[in-house]
Amino acid sequence: MVKLVSLHISRSFIQSPLSRNQEWIDLTLDYAISTVTVAGKMSNTHWALRPFKGHFLPETADMSRQFTRARELLRPTLEARLQQRDKVPNDLMQWIINNYPDQEDDLTLHTRLQLEAVQAATYNLAIMQRPLDSSRVVELAEMRQLLEGVAKIEPDRDCERESLCTVTIPTPRWKHSAGWCLRLGTIYDDDSLWTDPTSFDGYRFEKLRTIKGNELKFQYASTSTSELNWGYGTHACPGRHYASNQIKLMIVSLLSRYEFQFDHEQTDKKAIVERPPNVVDGVRIMPNPQTLVMVRSLGNVNEGCE
């Protein structure tokens, strides 16, 4: 999945041949892994020690080395773009050149944007209780429902609200003192807002949109006081629509080629299929790495699971 994300983003952000260069692909993957590893280690470190610890982490040195090599690979492409000017590809690099002439030759900026674009998502396809209708997959209708259900059951735990002053919440009356922090993802566990909030339901928001007045609410990239995965207000993620479309396109590509199931479904077909619990590590929520997801090509279903 991570490689698929890297290939997809690279194609959007910079055209071939660099986007299909194996060394470039490996660099984007390694840089993403190093970044996540550093973030995980730093999240468990006292804030006062983080500036010192960061310099001694081996992954920090790896990131510096990876960034330097990425600059070297990107330089010929950027120089060719600046000289060419005509018949150039329509990608992120060209967009920066066209819209930010003062930074068009900033190799560090271009490299950072390319490397920091890589991101990944989910293994919840295997738990869908009924198959996704192919025509609706093309329309991305059921795809949106799946992703909305995933976003609710796996909220962004690194997003916190800190009170800068004492706040009194009237109903129920509760005083929130200055300096307190609240995990915004906890709103998705509130049973006064959601039915069976801790269970995964890929069609939860489809049902909610059937209620009059909710027809346009609860979209995957929506932001509101009850939908905080992408942030809220001026702090909402500006790239959420691009990211959501990217995820949808990748899953459509996977569903059109493969089918998925958990390994325990194969051994016990009569058992009720349950989604394996997540692994929570600090601010990170991850699929259980010990869970085996079986994949079979739809092109030849007789070959068995791979």
UniProtKB/Swiss-Prot annotation:
Heme binds at residue 237. It holds the Pfam family p450. It is an enzyme of class 1 (oxidoreductase). The keyword Oxidoreductase applies. Pathway: Mycotoxin biosynthesis. Belongs to the cytochrome P450 family. Cytochrome P450 monooxygenase; part of the gene cluster that mediates the biosynthesis of aspirochlorine (or antibiotic A30641), an unusual halogenated spiro compound with distinctive antifungal properties due to selective inhibition of protein biosynthesis, and which is also active against bacteria, viruses, and murine tumor cells. The non-ribosomal peptide synthetase (NRPS) aclP is responsible the formation of the diketopiperazine (DKP) core from the condensation of 2 phenylalanine residues. This is Cytochrome P450 monooxygenase aclO.
